[in-house]
């Protein structure tokens, strides 16, 4: 029997290794636990990270993973098959990874997911990470009062675009600061302030 996409959530809250149990069954052995022994511990949330652009109707994106750094820490798990430098082609499903977090309560799990998203560094292709963070911070999701029409009801691309612009402004200011410290402030300031600058606001 195949595993469900959300099996890491089950593994986090039960402490079981479902793949190991499958292998035991394939070998003709019994499960290593009984129904009575199953206990649920805490809350887990899974986010499907895809190479799709949430600011452009979630259209699939292609390109090279220029940056690919997974978040680390207790209660954080990343199931993936990609490494930095690999190509995201047009031929397959745009799924990059599954990001799963576990904490004592749902509220803490949401906070941990936000931190994990912030620590998950991907550049070269657009991803659904910003949308995932938007959901984790939204009052409807936090309260549990939502349904499958969440995007239709609450989400507009502009909500992410404004955040991306602010992040890029901060990145540009940090770059100027580094250049100033290296003695190239004049060149950097001129490039940023120039009306016909070659800089384009795009994904990093």
Model regions: which residues?
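Catalytic cores of soluble metabolic enzymes centered on carboxylation/carboxyl-transfer
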Residues: 4-204
